[in-house]
A protein has these predicted regions:
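Structured, solvent-exposed acidic/aromatic patches
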Residues: 6-218
Length: 218
């Protein structure tokens, strides 16, 4: 096994010279940036509003970002993490992180369901334009994703969470039109976009393209 591409943009790394680095362990998820950014904004959100819809959306975004961190590193600071993103707190096991995320997603859906037809300001939502039902679908789909990922480790909990997600009245993603996608350029890019932004695989000496895709979304 080995690497198929440099971890950094610009093709200026050492992989092409068969000198692998450990950059994939820090560039792929950028947990040093995700955690402080998520929790700093999460704190600010709670300071400026008590709207249950907006706060539920914030919880969904937090889970969407943080589950990738725990899937990469296993134990992470989560339930006791400071709102400033401090890492100087005890780590939670991945089992405890997943259980906390299930509770947060359930609470978010519970808060959003009574407001499913009451869309909020479109200019406050760069992903779904204020469409509350889309956020419910995202929460259910994240719940289903997490359930599938523990199907061997905790089959009973996996079954319970998966069935709960798909049986919700709003349901889960059924097409790419449901995807949570945020297009951004310049300095406002997602710190993990380098992992998915160039989805082209070439093999053989003639550079034949085996697969080609673009972008990533939930």
């Amino acid at each position: 096994g080995g690497y198929m591409a440099d971890a950094n943009a610009g093709f200026a790394n050492t992989i092409s010279n068969y000198n692998p680095t450990d950059n994939w362990t820090n560039v792929f998820m950028k947990s040093d940036k995700i955690i402080p950014v998520i929790y700093t904004n999460y704190k600010q959100l709670h300071q400026v509003t008590d709207d249950p819809v907006i706060l539920a959306v914030g919880d969904i975004i937090k889970v969407a970002a943080m589950h990738r961190v725990t899937d990469t590193y296993g134990p992470i600071p989560y339930t006791q993490i400071g709102q400033d993103g401090s890492l100087t707190v005890p780590y939670d096991s991945q089992e405890d992180v997943y259980k906390a995320m299930f509770k947060e997603l359930d609470a978010a859906v519970e808060a959003l369901m009574p407001n499913r037809t009451n869309n909020f300001a479109a200019d406050a939502d760069a992903i779904y334009g204020g469409n509350v039902e889309k956020w419910i679908k995202l929460a259910n789909s994240l719940k289903l994703r997490l359930a599938m990922r523990i199907s061997y480790a905790a089959p009973e909990l996996s079954k319970q969470m998966a069935e709960s997600a798909v049986k919700n009245e709003v349901g889960v993603f059924t097409s790419n039109d449901d995807n949570a996608r945020f297009d951004s350029w310049g300095t406002d890019g997602n710190p993990i976009k380098v992992a998915v932004e160039y989805n082209k695989v070439k093999t053989h000496t003639n550079g034949t393209a085996c697969t080609t895709a673009a972008g990533d979304s939930h």
